[in-house]
Each structure stands twice: as C-alpha cells, then as structure tokens.
C-alpha cells in the first residue's frame, strides 16, 4: 500500500486548531452514529474547506477512529500540497475512470488510523466521472471498513460536483469564510446541497476576525478549476 506523509508545516498548523476541531468532532459524534460519511464543501474556493477536511480527519483519527479522507476536489486539489508521496501514486480519478483498483488508491499515512485517497490527475470530465457507477461502488465497498469517511468536495457555489458526492453521504458541512460571502449565497448553497438528499449538519464559520461586520460577495459559477491553480 502506498504511503503518504503529511508535511510538517500542515501538521503544525493543525496542532494550533486542535481544540477547535476536537469540539467539531464531538458535535459530529453527538449528531448520531449514522453520520459517518461526510461531505465538506464551501460556496467558493479559498474559504478553508480543504484545511477543515484535513483537520477534522486528523481529529477523528487521533481520537481512535479509523478514518478515510477522500480528496474529491479533482479540479483544484489543495491536499496535494498537504500530503506528499515518495513515488508515483494513483488517485480517485484513476479509479473512477477504470484505470485503477480501489486498493491501489487508498494510501496509508504517517498518522495512525488515518488513510487518504488522493485526487489523482485533473480529468477532462470531472462531473461525468463522479456520476458514473464507480463512485457509489467505492462508497459501498468502504463504508463498513472505516468509522468515518471525510470527503473534501469542490465548492458548491462554483460547480455541482459537491451535490453529486453528497448524495452518497450521510451528511454535509458547509464551510464559509467570515466577511467574504453574503448570507443569501450561503443559504442558496445549503439548499443546493440539501436537494441531494444529504443531511445538513452545520456551518463552520472560518477565518473569523473581530473586525468582520458584513458578508462579501462571489461569482464565476462554472469557472472553477480553469483559473490559475496557484490562487488556491
């Protein structure tokens, strides 16, 4: 099995917010034992959903739960800079396109009880890949192996992928950056996700500052992943 190492800087960053994510983990546990497959999304890019996904998965693993973190943001992966491999790895897109077995894409990490499915190479048809039978087949195969499965999805305000993924999940969490996104866009994102049939578990207000007084704005639906990837 391929092994990934979480980079030291990311591990130190997660340590600083450990208590915060331990509290979120506890709230998830109290929400019900049936809530074990969770989609994490945001309205747009740069709000911290990938960091939230990683930190939550770390918290669950460190609490003794066998946890799988899936990088399903195949258009614009942030986790590729969080976990490093010594050699060539296969990821989610390889499996969804029929070019890898499930066992080929689940990677061990240097964190006990935490495994990761990398995103893989950027595909020409991300949404179509998620809609084929392989994604649900994967979830069915792994749901009884892990205590928790955390799926980092693309922003629901930019592409529909997150709702497709959430359809196979028990619940979803919406991450939003304080002072950046207008409330009505957050509410619209929540409604879009709920249409998938997945349960709304809550909103994480990220990057909070005492100076924040209003919500911002956003746009560019459909252009996600086509801009300079260095922005994220």
Swiss-Prot record:
Its EC number is 2.7.10.2. It comes from the Bacteria. GO terms for molecular function: ATP binding; non-membrane spanning protein tyrosine kinase activity. SUPFAM superfamilies: P-loop containing nucleoside triphosphate hydrolases. InterPro entries: AAA_dom, Bact_polysacc_biosynth/exp, P-loop_NTPase, Wzc-like_C. Dephosphorylated and activated by CpsB. Keywords: ATP-binding, Capsule biogenesis/degradation, Exopolysaccharide synthesis, Kinase, Nucleotide-binding, Phosphoprotein, Transferase, Tyrosine-protein kinase. It is an enzyme of class 2 (transferase). It catalyses: L-tyrosyl-[protein] + ATP = O-phospho-L-tyrosyl-[protein] + ADP + H(+). Pathway: Capsule biogenesis; capsule polysaccharide biosynthesis. GO terms for biological process: capsule polysaccharide biosynthetic process. GO terms for cellular component: plasma membrane. Autophosphorylated. Involved in the regulation of capsular polysaccharide biosynthesis. Autophosphorylation of CpsD attenuates its activity and reduces the level of encapsulation. May be part of a complex that directs the coordinated polymerization and export to the cell surface of the capsular polysaccharide. Belongs to the CpsD/CapB family. NCBIfam families: eps_fam. This is Tyrosine-protein kinase CpsD. It comes from Streptococcus agalactiae serotype Ia (strain ATCC 27591 / A909 / CDC SS700).
